């Protein structure tokens, strides 16, 4: 600055002194006028000239910010007085989505470096909708308050003739904001941006209008991704539903039988020539040619923008009879999810019809299969048939096809073969399909019916759509129902026809149906009527809502803004036809909590007492982002609907393959009776009903006699089939599985999948899942099945009831607690039954009619479900019930357990399996029904085998112990002994192997005692056993116990069994002792390490303490030493001074003091500075003393003089 000539300029308004280069002021003239608009960017010189014309700034300044200035506007602001950045436009933001993205630059003027004088600065921002629209702000760094703002669409003049439309932001982080706007808001944004711009295709066609540009934005930028009702498992992850994914997997389609709507396209045929393509062409997928569509309204575009892909419909060529065209055909396609292999889908070219029909009609294609009777059921499980051929109990899946009946006078209906392979729609979505019918030449309108395969239930009116009013000249004709012969109708005419001479089809618009999008993507439960779409445009719009998504568990607080002001109104929010209460937090803001729902997009709407109050918006349910396992235990008990459904089907397929392998090996499954048909009323969701039907069809065909186990690979999260059913809340499936388990009691494969005490990777039982997710009916069924699951904690130590309380399922927890109290109140211990009168055995025991494997521990469960079958509440039993009645009285499908392990022989007669628990608990009162036909329960009293074996060994006679057990019994032995000897060695080896491995089975109780909570059987003393065993030889009590005595061989067998048990227990005890020693050694080693660490810490602490004490002592001693040293120095100085003073006093007169300096030797007396000071003090004291002595002498002399006046 000091090396160049500068000019001082003072601004009039702020009196600021701005120093600018003299060369700059000479080359830039002052501007007399600021142009309000300029359709090009200003040069740097022009910008600088505007900013340095200070005398005109007061005249040019704008006092208020302008809202959405037009293209080319130039405005001057004072940033201290006007917030010019709030101009109404939406500018690009940074990646964080909060701050605007700005580009800053220093500008050169006349080639002068800005660093040399630091005067001109610029800031640029770009539009988020049209990236070529900029706002540039300029100011002087020495005068930053005055800002020159210029709005301009950059390629306005250069690129107008090159393309057919401007460039829009296709991928932007801000799209979520501006794509929520309505058509009017987008028009308000774009009109000022394209002010003064003329767009054309350069081929003589008419210019584009801003309305067409807005329509193009709405067509090419969908507001939301295509609705996905579940996360696809075929892709890389579970996904959040943000990408459109097509999958033809069978399980994929079974899990989500919803309609994935695609775009609706209409092609109308005029009288004379095909329609010309409009200037705006809606985009289609790259593999399909673009269909000619007319631009529809804004609501139509916004409503259909979430569809996956548009359809392509090729219009039929016009034909004429007698030189004039009489009509045409328009087809509205509403396709389903997928296509069959080899079929021609509606997304491909539609072949023109062979014979065009004269009247103009509009057919709704909603079916996928031709009307044909279903094939007979095959014995093997076919997933494709499971999807496409609904059987009894199906509540979704749609009809077999469409059978439109055209009651026309001339011509017969020839269905288009290309329309048949489309996928089927569910009845609810099909009933809401759109079928406008237009008549011609005074003919009556046609009626279209959507028919199911074998259901004669008529769909009522609430699910239909009211008629759309036709054009003013046409009068609606009264529709007449024409049901096909032999079948009941499943729908009504959705639109009435219009009689008139016009054959042109009106363009189809979704503006009258704000809820169509939400209805198409919803999966409504049967029996719940859908709310009728509102035709009136008086519905308010939801301005904003947050958050926009939730996990499938729901419970997230959602705030919704809009024109809600009535405090007395009873507001509710409808999530996919699930209404939840809403409260008015403040005027314009509603608060609600979203319900649980499966993954996908759902419609959200605000409703009042009299009906809907707002239009629908899209709310998203996202899947949790984990592939197989949650990251922590806290995220474990969460519903992953699609994965659970997939896993259920995988388990059923594996079981079906297992059955097929058994059948192929020669063990043909027994042909049992067919399962009874399931009623349609109250059967729950469709997926559960169809799985129940599949399981019921597998029950009579199943045979599980092989000892092999199913190889499942890696099960989903360690969850069994019963886990998955409980997590989904499928009570009917749980009941069916319990019936299957009761029928097949000896199946280890079935025990792996259907065990109420089985646990997953985090030790959660099926009852834990049902309690955590609030499925009351399923939880009660599982509790009735085996109440022991209520006391099994997960890996965090939480019990099912505590999890239910913590998650807000209070009603479920109270119901289970009440059932538990009822069972505990009716329990009574059973007395011992009288001894059995069987001549073959001398032990009173209960023979189990089931296989031996029922009494063993479950190898897939940490807790065995076999020993303790938890029965439902039953009246108390008499105390004299015999123990033989136990097998017939075990309830709830729990397998019976032999009282003793040595009672290994099963009876040949199989008793019928007991029925499982009563019907599911009623949802209204939570109490079990009175007529539950469950048999009464009897407690199974356990026996301590170790103590019993010891008593048996002590009581066995010595001669029995000394006998060689391996010898063959003598000829006089009973036939029972002969037959028993053959399998005795096998029995003993089996018993020994069992007892060797019994501790390896996972069990919560110690091996010495079974996991029971009831009283134990009293062990008889040794004398009683001796008396009992010696009764066969002594002859005592033969009259009373002749039938209860044991033979020598039986006694020897009993003795060997007791020895095996005792030996196994000793081995187990030694092994346990060794394990305890190892654990103790590890504990001692760990404690010793800790002790050494603590000892070293204590030693360091003691050392530190001693060092501290020593430092304190040293410091105190040093202080005292220093004080003593100072005292001694001062004392020596005082003595020296005193000596000098005494010598001075002894002198007769004042010493003659030479005028010169003191000799050098005298200086040596004052060694230190303090001594010098002390000497000076002493000298001052001596001078005062000398002066006082003089005064005293003078006073004495004055007193000695005679006083005047006294002489006489």
Curated annotation (Swiss-Prot):
Positions of short motif Nuclear localization signal:
78-86
Q: Which UniProt keywords apply?
A: Activator, ANK repeat, DNA-binding, Nucleus, Repeat, Transcription, Transcription regulation
Location within or outside the cell: Nucleus
Residue intervals of the IQ domain: 1054-1083, 1107-1136
Query: What superkingdom does the record give?
Result: Eukaryota
InterPro entries, per database record: Ankyrin_rpt-contain_sf, CG-1_dom, Ig-like_fold, Ig_E-set, IPT_dom
Picking any one GO biological process from the record gives:
cardiac muscle hypertrophy in response to stress
Cite the IPT/TIG domain residue spans from the record.
544-622
Regions of compositional bias (Low complexity) in chain numbering: 294-305, 319-328, 829-853
Map the ANK repeats onto residue numbers.
717-750, 762-792, 796-826
GO cellular component labels: chromatin; nucleus
- Give start and end residues of each DNA-binding region: 30-160
Write out the biased-composition intervals (Pro residues): 275-288, 371-380, 464-476
Among the GO molecular function terms of this UniProt record, one is:
sequence-specific DNA binding
Q: Where is this region: Disordered?
A: 269-328, 366-418, 437-507, 826-881, 908-936, 1144-1166
What does this gene product do?
Transcription activator. May act as tumor suppressor.
Family assignment? Belongs to the CAMTA family.
Query: Subunit composition?
Result: May interact with calmodulin.
Q: What is this protein called?
A: Calmodulin-binding transcription activator 2
Give the species this sequence originates from. Answer: Mus musculus (Mouse)
């Amino acid at each position: 600055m000091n090396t160049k000539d500068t000019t001082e300029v003072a601004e009039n308004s702020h009196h600021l002194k701005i120093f600018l280069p003299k060369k700059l002021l000479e080359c830039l003239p002052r501007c007399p006028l600021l142009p309000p608009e300029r359709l090009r960017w200003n040069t740097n010189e022009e910008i600088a000239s505007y900013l340095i014309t200070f005398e005109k700034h007061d005249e040019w300044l704008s006092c208020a910010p302008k809202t959405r200035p037009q293209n080319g506007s130039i405005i001057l602001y004072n940033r201290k007085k006007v917030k010019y950045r709030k101009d109404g436009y939406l500018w690009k933001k940074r990646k964080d989505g909060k701050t605007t993205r700005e580009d800053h630059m220093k500008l050169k003027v006349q080639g002068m470096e800005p660093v040399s004088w630091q005067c001109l600065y610029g800031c640029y921002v770009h539009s988020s909708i049209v990236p070529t629209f900029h706002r540039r702000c300029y100011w002087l760094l020495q005068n930053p308050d005055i800002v020159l703002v210029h709005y301009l669409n950059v390629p306005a003049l250069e690129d107008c003739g090159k393309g057919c439309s401007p460039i829009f932001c296709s991928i932007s982080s801000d799209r979520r904001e501006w794509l929520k706007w309505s058509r009017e808001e987008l028009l308000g944004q774009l009109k000022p941006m394209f002010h003064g711009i003329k767009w054309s295709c350069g081929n003589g066609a008419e210019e584009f209008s801003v309305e067409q540009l807005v329509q193009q934005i709405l067509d090419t930028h969908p507001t939301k991704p295509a609705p996905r009702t579940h996360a696809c498992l075929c892709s890389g992850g579970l996904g959040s539903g943000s990408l459109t994914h097509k999958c033809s997997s069978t399980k994929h389609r079974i899990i989500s039988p919803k309609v994935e709507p695609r775009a609706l396209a209409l092609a109308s045929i005029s009288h004379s020539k095909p329609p010309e393509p409009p200037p705006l062409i809606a985009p289609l997928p790259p593999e399909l040619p673009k269909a000619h569509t007319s631009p529809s309204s804004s609501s139509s575009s916004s409503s259909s923008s979430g569809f996956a892909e548009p359809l392509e419909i090729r219009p039929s060529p016009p034909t004429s009879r007698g030189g004039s065209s009489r009509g045409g055909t328009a087809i509205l396609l509403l396709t389903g999810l997928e296509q069959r292999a080899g079929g021609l889908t509606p997304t491909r070219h539609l072949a023109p019809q062979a014979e065009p029909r004269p009247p103009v009609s509009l057919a709704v294609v909603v079916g996928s299969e031709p009307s044909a009777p279903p094939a007979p059921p095959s014995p093997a499980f076919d997933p494709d048939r499971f999807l496409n051929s609904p059987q009894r109990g199906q509540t979704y899946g749609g009809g077999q096809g469409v059978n439109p009946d055209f009651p026309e006078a001339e011509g017969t209906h020839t269905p288009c073969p290309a329309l048949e392979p489309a996928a089927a729609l569910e009845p609810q979505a099909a009933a809401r399909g759109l079928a406008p019918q237009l008549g011609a030449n005074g003919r009556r309108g046609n009626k279209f019916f959507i028919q199911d395969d074998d259901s004669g239930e008529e769909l009522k009116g609430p699910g239909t759509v009211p008629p759309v009013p036709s054009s003013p000249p046409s009068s609606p004709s009264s529709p007449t129902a024409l049901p096909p012969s032999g079948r009941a109708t499943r729908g009504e005419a959705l639109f009435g026809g219009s009689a008139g001479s016009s054959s042109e089809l009106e363009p189809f618009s979704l503006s009258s149906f704000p809820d169509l999008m939400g209805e198409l993507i919803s999966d409504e439960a049967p029996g719940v009527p859908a709310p009728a779409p509102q035709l009136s445009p008086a519905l308010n719009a939801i301005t904003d809502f947050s958050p926009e998504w939730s996990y499938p568990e729901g419970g997230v607080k959602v705030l919704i803004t809009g024109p809600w002001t009535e405090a007395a109104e009873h507001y509710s929010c409808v999530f996919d036809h699930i209404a939840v209460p809403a409260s008015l937090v403040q005027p314009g803001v509603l608060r609600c909590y979203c319900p649980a729902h499966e993954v996908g997009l759902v419609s959200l709407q605000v409703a009042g007492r009299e009906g809907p109050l707002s239009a629908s918006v899209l709310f998203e349910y996202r899947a949790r982002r984990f592939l197989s396992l949650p990251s922590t235990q806290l995220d474990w008990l969460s519903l992953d609907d699609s994965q659970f459904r997939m896993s259920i089907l995988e388990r059923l397929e594996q079981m079906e393959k297992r059955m097929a392998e058994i059948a192929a090996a020669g063990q043909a499954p027994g042909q049992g009776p067919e399962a009874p048909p399931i009623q349609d009323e109250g059967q729950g969701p469709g997926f559960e009903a169809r799985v129940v039907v599949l399981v019921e069809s597998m029950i009579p065909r199943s045979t599980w006699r092989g000892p092999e186990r199913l190889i499942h690979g890696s099960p989903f999260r360690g969850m069994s089939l019963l886990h998955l059913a409980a997590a989904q809340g499928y009570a009917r499936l749980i009941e069916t599985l319990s019936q299957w388990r009761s029928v097949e009691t000896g199946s280890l494969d079935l025990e792996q999948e259907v065990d109420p005490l089985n646990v997953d990777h985090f030790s959660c039982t099926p009852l834990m899942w049902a309690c955590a997710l609030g499925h009351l009916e399923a939880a009660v069924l599982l509790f009735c099945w085996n109440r022991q699951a209520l006391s099994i904690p997960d890996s965090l130590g939480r019990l099912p009831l505590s999890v239910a309380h913590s998650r807000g399922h209070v009603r479920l927890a109270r119901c289970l607690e009440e059932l538990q109290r009822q069972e505990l109140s009716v329990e009574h211990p059973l007395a011992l039954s009288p001894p059995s009168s069987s001549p073959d055995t001398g032990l009173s025991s209960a023979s189990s009619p089931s296989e031996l494997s029922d009494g063993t521990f479950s190898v897939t469960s940490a807790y065995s479900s076999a020993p303790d079958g938890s029965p439902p509440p039953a009246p108390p039993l008499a105390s004299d019930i015999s123990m033989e009645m136990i097998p017939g009285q075990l309830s709830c499908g729990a397998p019976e357990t032999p009282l003793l392990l040595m009672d290994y022989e099963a009876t040949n007669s199989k008793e019928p399996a007991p029925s499982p628990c009563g019907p599911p608990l009623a949802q209204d009162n939570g109490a079990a029904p009175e007529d539950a036909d469950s048999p009464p329960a009897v407690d199974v009293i356990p026996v301590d085998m170790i103590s019993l074996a010891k008593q048996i060994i002590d009581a066995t006679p010595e001669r029995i112990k000394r006998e060689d057990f391996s010898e063959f019994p003598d000829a006089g032995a009973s036939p029972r002994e002969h037959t028993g000897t053959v399998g005795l060695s096998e029995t003993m080896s089996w018993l020994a192997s069992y007892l060797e491995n019994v501790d390896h089975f996972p069990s919560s109780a110690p091996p010495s005692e079974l996991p029971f909570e009831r009283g134990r059987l009293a062990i008889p003393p040794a004398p009683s056993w001796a008396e009992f065993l010696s009764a066969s030889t002594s002859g005592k009590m033969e009259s009373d116990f002749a039938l209860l005595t044991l033979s020598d061989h039986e006694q020897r067998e009993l003795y060997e069994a007791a020895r095996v048990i005792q030996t196994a227990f000793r081995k187990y005890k030694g092994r346990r002792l060794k394990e305890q020693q190892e654990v103790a050694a590890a504990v001692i080693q760990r404690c010793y390490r800790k002790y050494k660490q603590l000892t070293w810490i204590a030693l360091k602490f003691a050392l530190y303490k001693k060092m501290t004490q020593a430092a304190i002592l040293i410091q105190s001693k040093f202080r005292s030493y220093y004080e003593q040293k100072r005292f001694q120095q001062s004392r020596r100085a005082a003595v020296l001074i005193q000596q000098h003073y005494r010598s001075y006093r002894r002198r007769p007169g004042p010493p003659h003091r030479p005028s010169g300096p003191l000799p050098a030797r005298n200086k040596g007396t004052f060694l230190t500075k303090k001594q010098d000071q002390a000497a000076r003090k002493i000298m001052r004291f001596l001078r005062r003393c000398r002066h006082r002595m003089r005064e005293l002498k003078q006073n004495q002399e004055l007193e000695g003089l005679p006083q005047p006046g006294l002489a006489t």
